[in-house]
Design a protein with these regions (language model features):
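C-terminal, non-catalytic tails of nucleotide-sugar-dependent glycosyltransferases
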Residues: 1-5, 116, 126, 138-165, ...
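Acidic donor-binding segment of Leloir-type glycosyltransferases
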Residues: 26-68
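Short aromatic/hydrophobic "clamp" motif used to bind/position activated sugar donors
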Residues: 88
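Glycine-rich, basic loop-to-helix element that forms the pyrophosphate-binding segment
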Residues: 66-83
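Active-site acidic Asp-centered loop
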Residues: 41, 91-94, 188
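A short, conserved alpha-helix in the catalytic core of glycosyltransferases
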Residues: 102-106, 160-185, 189-220
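N-proximal low-complexity "stem/linker" segments adjacent to membrane-targeting elements
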Residues: 1-27
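Conserved donor NDP-sugar-binding/catalytic core segment of glycosyltransferases
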Residues: 95-141
Length: 285
């Protein structure tokens, strides 16, 4: 069968970005049974509302309004409450579809009994990688692998190009069974900006489901345009709070290391290079 997929896209003020995203879905998606839920967050320009009105004429599009401040987790949870599909597809507004089979490919992996969520390969407009899976502990809490590597390269042990289980993937484009999302309690709303996708994936894994990275789906990602500007001091403080939250809640995996990552490999370099050995680089007296 062809289950309904609910695509959830948060948006604020961005008309061109959103339009490029939505048009790429309409024009390029071979799979037909989907709805798009746009969660409008405090836009004020006449231009964006004109575009919303035009979009709303399409029966596949549902526009809902989140009137509180920016909180990525709360906005997406709100979107899910309006979703009719059994499958959720979280999508950033600055992502563009490349391949017609993207949704059906994600769905075929997500429909497997053991799969909880599916992430994909995201590439920058210059054809380098932005996301090919995440590793817990990378750069502190978690980080994307193979960042800035040319997209056609396969990387260490071909990992950038192999379908595989991982601890987490980014929610810039992530499909999840709705029942799995609800069982995990959705996105953690204390994590307003950072690590909410990592946290959700770890919750899903703790319920016994797998997180799968699917490199056969590639989308362009124009990176974080959907957040308003804010006071940088407040930003830093909030980021620290979110790091603390992750440290407290996921102490065990942060201590033991990501089960899908070799503990002899670096946690500061995303390219699977070896950790320096103790004493390396010291001059002999």
């Amino acid at each position: 069968g062809e289950p309904l997929v609910s695509v959830v896209i948060p948006n604020r003020e961005e008309k061109e970005t959103l339009q490029a995203c939505v048009e790429s879905i309409f024009e390029k998606t071979a799979y037909k049974n989907y709805e798009i839920i746009i969660v409008e967050n405090n836009s004020s320009s006449e231009e964006i509302f004109r575009y919303y009105r035009k979009l709303s004429e399409d029966p596949r599009v549902h526009l809902i309004r989140w009137k509180k401040g920016f909180n990525y987790s709360a906005i997406n949870n709100f979107g899910v409450r309006h979703a009719k599909g059994d499958y959720l597809l979280f999508l950033n507004n600055d992502v563009k579809v490349i391949d017609p089979d993207w949704m059906s490919e994600m769905l075929s992996v997500c429909q497997r009994k053991e799969t909880g969520a599916v992430g994909v390969k995201l590439i920058y407009p210059d054809n380098t990688i932005q996301h090919a899976g995440c590793v817990v502990g990378m750069g502190g809490i978690a980080g994307n692998m193979f960042v800035n590597m040319p997209a056609e390269r396969t990387g260490y042990l071909h990992k950038a190009s192999l379908l595989q289980d991982m601890s987490c993937v980014t929610a810039a484009c992530m499909m999840m069974k709705k029942e799995v999302f609800l069982e995990a309690g959705g996105f953690t709303e204390e994590l307003a900006v950072a690590f909410n996708d990592v946290d959700l994936c770890l919750k899903v894994r703790s319920h016994g489901h797998l997180i799968v990275y699917d490199p056969y789906v590639k989308l362009y990602h124009y990176e974080s345009k959907s957040r308003g500007t804010e006071d940088s001091e407040e930003k830093v403080r909030r980021f620290q709070t979110e790091i603390e939250y992750m440290r407290c809640h996921w102490l065990d995996i942060l201590k033991k290391g990501d089960p899908y990552y070799n503990k002899n490999l670096s946690l500061t370099k995303w390219n699977y290079s070896l950790k320096p050995l103790p004493g390396m680089g010291k001059k002999k007296g």
